[in-house]
Amino acid sequence: MRSDIFGSRWCLLISVVMALLVVISLCAIACSAESSDLKILVVHSYHEDWGWNQDIQKGIIEGLSRQGYIEEQDYQIKTFYMDTKVTYVTPEQVEERGIKAIDLIRDYKPDLVFVNDDDALKYVAIAYIEKYPDENIPFVFSGTNLDPSIYAPINSLEKPGGTTTGALERFPFHDAFSLGKSIVPQATRIVLMADPSSSSTFVVSAFKERYLDKVSDSPLEIIGPIQVNTFDEWKAKIMEYQTEADLLGILTYHQLRDEEGNVVPAPEVVDWTVHNSDLPEIGILTFHAEDGFMAALGVSGYKTGIYIGILGGEILGGTSPGDIAIIDPKVTDIAFNLERASMLEIKIPNDELIKADVVFQTIGSSRY
């Protein structure tokens, strides 16, 4: 009899403990769901494998964490790639991709939207604000080469007003050319090469306006920038300037087309260039060195992402984006490719290696 009573009490105790565990689990799930109710959307202008996009995305998550917002715990994140550099390249296609992103915003109802590069700013953020002026979804942009105050919803860089702020992208050309001069002291001329994409046109225009027309102490004489449409034209120009320049400046190379009109994969462009040109290359984005060019000094995607992520955290905390000035955060990275330097029989100076943010040992990228 006594053992029966003991057994019954033991079963009751186990039942109570199990019930408590269930309640605790449900509370934990509920709390987790409640804490991650915030929804964030990131819209990239280009494709998923574009190195800049990957760096920006990682930086955003890091920047938000520095403001106390942890992915999955405090917010859910969704990403949309417009893919306007390789796949959807006509004006009509770019606009259609913008509409898809806007539809996603309507369905997802994010608390904050990050838009990366000029297409996403124009065709998503600005288009959304102009179409739905009474909504207050905040937008934070990055990778913007033009002056965003040309758009009506942005009053000025100092006081944007409305629901939009972000980071300008201003390439540090002078620093990049100085790096080239440091590595190859005898160099006096650099030829700049670019593909025909709209983003390249922005970069070329900005370079002429902000560098050629204003800088009087350039460490190198500039040839170009030269924009070419096809891979064959790229090859011809590269060979033409083997004796006319001392350095090759890499702006862009992702929309060169073959005889059939198809985009030539970037690794193919890099591979041909490094095996047929004797000009040391200086790129303007870190992943140019990762792909195989000798050196790069440019705006850091990761650090830019951290910057706008911190801005995003500030906005989630209650600050109006319209009160946050739009600036160039002036965050750069230096990168080298040692295999390419070895091919050119160039020794990267120790003081430059010390300053490098990343050094790649081999030619070739895993980002495509």
Show which residues each predicted segment covers.
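Short hydrophobic alpha-helices and adjacent helix-cap/hinge residues
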Residues: 2-10, 28-368
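Bacterial N-terminal signal peptides
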Residues: 15-27
